[in-house]
C-alpha cells in the first residue's frame, strides 16, 4: 500500500525525476511562467516554493541549497535570479508564491495541461515587455 508516500513518480526513475524538476524550475525562474502537464506543475509548485523560501534567507547556506537542487551549469545564475530578483518581491509573503491555471487538454494526447507562474511577477513581466516594445517602436532607423 502507498500510505503516506509524498510526491508523484511521474512514470520516471528517481534520477530522471530529479533532472525534470531541476529543468522545469530553471525554466520557470528564467521565463516567470511555463506551460506543462497538470501533474508536473503540481509537483513543481512545492519544489519552486521551497527554492524561493531558501532564496529569501539571503545567506550562503540558502544559496548552496538552491544550487544543490538546480542541476547543471546554470545553477549559479538561477540562484542569483532567485535571490536578487524574485525573493525581494516575496519578502512579506509566507508561501503561495506560484499559481496554477488549468488550460484545455493537449490536442494530440488529451493530457491535462496547466500554466504555472509566479503570483506577483506576471504583471511586472508584461509591463516590461510593453516598455521594451515601445522603446523599439520609437527608435530611429539608420
Predicted regions and their residues:
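Structured, basic alpha/beta domains of bacterial-type, RNA-associated proteins
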Residues: 1-19, 23-142
